[in-house]
């Protein structure tokens, strides 16, 4: 099971957890969870006017062995309006535009989608239950 929590945070709300949303999916091959502005495609939906987030921004996909990966999907623009970082424990790393990374099996962490022009972000926490 992969559990996701999401909080949309703007400068004045930094540190607040109000308005968190959650989604989960069983660890079955082909299971998918998406994060973005499109409520028809995404289980976790960001504010519609936050254009630094694509319609479908992040895709979590369960592989054939029950492990999960996340992809920062390429949008319609050649250069993204945001940056994405993956934090697991005390280690944080940037996630490249269009890149895919495996999530730790049985682990937890956070993906931060940071607007490049304003102090706001979308914080997506994950927990992979074994």
Where are these regions (language model features)?
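Intrinsically disordered, low-complexity acidic Ser/Thr-rich regulatory segments
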Residues: 1-50, 61, 100-129
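Generic signature of intrinsically disordered, low-complexity segments enriched in small/polar residues
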Residues: 71, 129-130
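Forkhead-associated
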Residues: 43-44, 50, 57-114
């Amino acid at each position: 099971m992969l559990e996701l929590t999401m909080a949309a945070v703007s400068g004045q709300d930094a540190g607040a957890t109000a308005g968190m949303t959650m989604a989960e999916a069983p660890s079955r091959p082909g299971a998918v969870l998406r994060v973005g502005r499109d409520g028809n495609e995404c289980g976790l939906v960001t504010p519609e006017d936050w254009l630094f987030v694509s319609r479908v921004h992040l895709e979590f996909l369960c592989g054939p062995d029950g492990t999960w990966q996340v992809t920062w999907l390429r949008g319609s623009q050649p250069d993204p309006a945001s940056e994405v970082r993956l934090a697991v424990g005390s280690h944080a790393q940037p996630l490249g535009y269009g890149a895919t990374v495996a999530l730790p099996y049985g682990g937890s962490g956070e993906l931060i989608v940071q607007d490049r022009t304003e102090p706001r972000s979308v914080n997506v926490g994950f927990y992979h239950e074994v």
